[in-house]
């Protein structure tokens, strides 16, 4: 088995999908998790205005709405959370995503004071924080807020990790990489886009340039620039297609580099890192 085949196997990616079937499968998955854990009544998800959180949010709201109808339990709720650092430059996209999702509840927590306070405390202790490192603090602070909400609201936190993100390790360890449930896992970027099209999302929500937008000194830095490879190449690779040797080498480099992010803390029994 080639490395490409092994990665595809681990991430569960299909070469082609039926969007309606994947929508149904995901909604049922989200419903089943809450039904199994009767002490949970809510899903919590940060909404950025990008493709991934828009899709995960819509599917979560659909699942919650069906659960309420099937059980007559009005305690089931989907809580969308806006988590800007100061003023988000593409706030209009976030509002457009919320209008599409129509969440039961929307909360806004501005993380700037918490992030800046942490950076200042570290600097006071003599630890200088790089802009890149500060970006990771932002991602982790967003998850702190979401788990605080989930803890108060009998909730589970939804993550937006998908195959095209997982393969490159393009997420913050214990930040956006930390969640209770990953409804998009197995889908690549173009497949997620296909689901949003079927769901009737505004094209602007899935055609916009993907960005983590975590670094102050590189605002709106495109994922593809940061990674050095296009999502088209990543998606093609995940679908078992041939791509250029340069693109393949870049993708596989990121796969190996991000391996530690796909595991729980390493124990003496682990050998994947050797």
UniProtKB/Swiss-Prot annotation:
Positions bound to deamido-NAD(+): 140, 173, 180, 260-261
Record's catalysed reaction(s): deamido-NAD(+) + NH4(+) + ATP = AMP + diphosphate + NAD(+) + H(+)
SUPFAM superfamilies found in the cross-reference section: Adenine nucleotide alpha hydrolases-like
Binding site for Mg(2+): 52, 165
InterPro entries: NAD/GMP_synthase, NAD_synthase, NH(3)-dep_NAD(+)_synth, Rossmann-like_a/b/a_fold
GO biological process, one term: NAD biosynthetic process
Pathway: Cofactor biosynthesis; NAD(+) biosynthesis; NAD(+) from deamido-NAD(+) (ammonia route): step 1/1
Binding annotation for ATP: 46-53, 160, 189, 211
EC number assigned by the record: 6.3.1.5
Pfam families hit by this protein: NAD_synthase
UniProt KW keywords: ATP-binding, Ligase, Magnesium, Metal-binding, NAD, Nucleotide-binding
GO function terms (MF aspect): ATP binding; glutaminase activity; metal ion binding; NAD+ synthase (glutamine-hydrolyzing) activity; NAD+ synthase activity
One cellular component (GO) term of this entry: cytoplasm
Self-association state and partner proteins as the record states: Homodimer.
Function recorded in the entry: Catalyzes the ATP-dependent amidation of deamido-NAD to form NAD. Uses ammonia as a nitrogen source.
Stated family: Belongs to the NAD synthetase family.
Protein name: NH(3)-dependent NAD(+) synthetase
Organism the protein comes from: Streptococcus pyogenes serotype M3 (strain ATCC BAA-595 / MGAS315)
């Amino acid at each position: 088995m080639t490395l490409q085949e092994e990665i595809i196997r681990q991430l569960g990616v299909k070469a082609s999908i039926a969007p309606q079937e994947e929508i149904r499968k995901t909604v049922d998955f989200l419903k089943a998790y809450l039904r199994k854990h009767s002490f949970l009544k809510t899903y919590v998800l940060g909404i950025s205005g990008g493709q991934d959180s828009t899709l995960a949010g819509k599917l979560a709201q659909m699942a919650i709405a069906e659960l309420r109808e099937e059980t007559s339990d009005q305690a089931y709720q989907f809580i969308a959370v806006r988590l800007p650092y100061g003023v988000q430059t593409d706030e209009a996209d976030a509002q457009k995503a919320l209008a599409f999702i129509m969440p039961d509840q929307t909360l806004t927590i501005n993380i700037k004071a918490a992030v800046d306070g942490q950076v200042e405390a570290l600097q006071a202790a003599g630890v200088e924080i790089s802009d890149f490192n500060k970006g990771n603090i932002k991602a982790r602070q967003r998850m702190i807020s979401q788990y605080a909400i989930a803890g108060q609201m009998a909730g589970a936190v939804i993550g937006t990790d998908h195959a095209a993100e997982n393969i490159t390790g393009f997420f913050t360890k214990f930040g956006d990489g930390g969640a209770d449930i990953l409804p998009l896992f197995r889908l690549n970027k173009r497949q997620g886009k296909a689901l949003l099209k079927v769901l009737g999302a505004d094209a602007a929500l899935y055609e916009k340039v993907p960005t983590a937008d975590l670094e102050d000194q590189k605002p709106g830095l495109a994922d593809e620039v940061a990674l050095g490879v296009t999502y088209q190449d990543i998606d093609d690779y995940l679908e078992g297609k041939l791509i250029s040797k340069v693109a393949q080498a870049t993708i596989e480099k990121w796969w190996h580099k991000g391996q530690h992010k796909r595991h729980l803390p390493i124990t003496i029994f682990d050998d994947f890192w050797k």
